[in-house]
């Protein structure tokens, strides 16, 4: 959005983290709940890329070193250890793992890319449920068919990590996973009225407002305010990160559905894509491509892996 106030808030939070830990010699791991508290690594590394402030990278490097005694994500992932077998298989670790992409972008070291790709694939294979939801009782267990709570926040974290994976690899199978999660889990975790979201959206069972399951989080006057109710809508918001993306050759349309997408090509020309369709209910998508001026560019269309007969 270009909201300067929002950016300033993030920078001030990052500066506070640096003053609290980097300037004092204290370690983030000493705060406990390390998979949660160390998740700031991906924000710090991204802020370093955006601002060039060396303190942010230094803080990220300290956290990376402390990973070795906690989640050990980089070494475990690069060593092809599946996520559910790693030391910290809770869902919050996925935000730590997003830091692997940021470190790869900063350093170019393949070990970070290798680790992220392996961890993502192991989750997709062993812990992504048939609904597109992730986790069983808030963590990876290596079996997606065991019934257990599939928490809203866990699925949103899986989708956020998948966006990073898609940006890294451009692999259309990742977009397939995002579509599966969006159209099943994210839609399913919301009441039709929009008033509440679930804590648990099961493969088979009953959907209940999150307030029934995690009432301990409630605040006076706001019984339905909790982590899941404020996080669930992000599943829809993430669509803006992966529906249309760029690669070295042009633009890639990953998501289908009625609507209009506007972007700017590398040439500086504006581009409008309009979809007329009732996808996924129907299989026909009419796409109107309208650049602001006549020009040649590459437009790639994702072919869903479930499609058996596709024509363009």
Per-region residue spans from a language model:
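Glycan-recognition and catalytic cores of secretory/periplasmic carbohydrate-active enzymes
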Residues: 1-312
């Amino acid at each position: 959005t270009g909201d300067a106030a929002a950016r300033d808030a993030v920078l001030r939070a990052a500066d506070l983290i640096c003053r609290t830990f980097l300037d004092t010699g204290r370690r983030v791991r000493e705060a406990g709940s390390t998979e949660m508290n160390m998740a700031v690594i991906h924000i710090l590394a991204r802020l370093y890329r955006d601002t060039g402030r060396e303190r942010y990278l230094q803080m990220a490097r300290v956290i990376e070193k402390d990973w070795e005694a906690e989640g050990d994500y980089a070494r475990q992932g690069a060593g092809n250890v599946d996520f559910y077998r790693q030391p910290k298989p809770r869902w919050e670790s996925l935000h730590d793992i997003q830091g692997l992409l940021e470190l790869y972008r900063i350093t170019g070291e393949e070990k970070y890319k290798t680790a992220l790709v392996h961890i993502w694939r192991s989750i997709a294979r062993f812990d992504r449920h048939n609904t597109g939801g992730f986790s069983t009782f808030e963590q990876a267990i290596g079996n997606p068919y065991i019934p257990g709570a599939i928490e809203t926040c866990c699925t949103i974290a899986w989708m956020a990590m998948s966006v990073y994976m898609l940006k890294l690899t451009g692999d259309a199978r990742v977009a397939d996973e995002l579509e599966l999660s969006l159209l099943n889990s994210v839609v399913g975790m919301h009441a039709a009225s929009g008033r509440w979201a679930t804590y648990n959206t099961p493969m088979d069972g009953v959907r209940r407002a999150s307030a029934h399951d995690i009432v301990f989080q409630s605040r006076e006057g706001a019984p339905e305010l909790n982590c899941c109710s404020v996080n669930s809508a992000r599943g829809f918001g993430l669509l803006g990160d992966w529906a249309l993306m760029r690669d070295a050759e042009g633009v890639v349309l990953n998501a289908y559905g009625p609507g209009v997408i506007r972007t700017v090509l590398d040439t500086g020309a504006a581009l409008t894509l309009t979809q007329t369709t009732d996808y996924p209910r129907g299989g026909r998508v009419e796409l109107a491509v309208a650049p602001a001026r006549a020009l040649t560019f590459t437009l790639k269309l994702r072919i869903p892996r479930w499609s058996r007969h596709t024509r363009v």
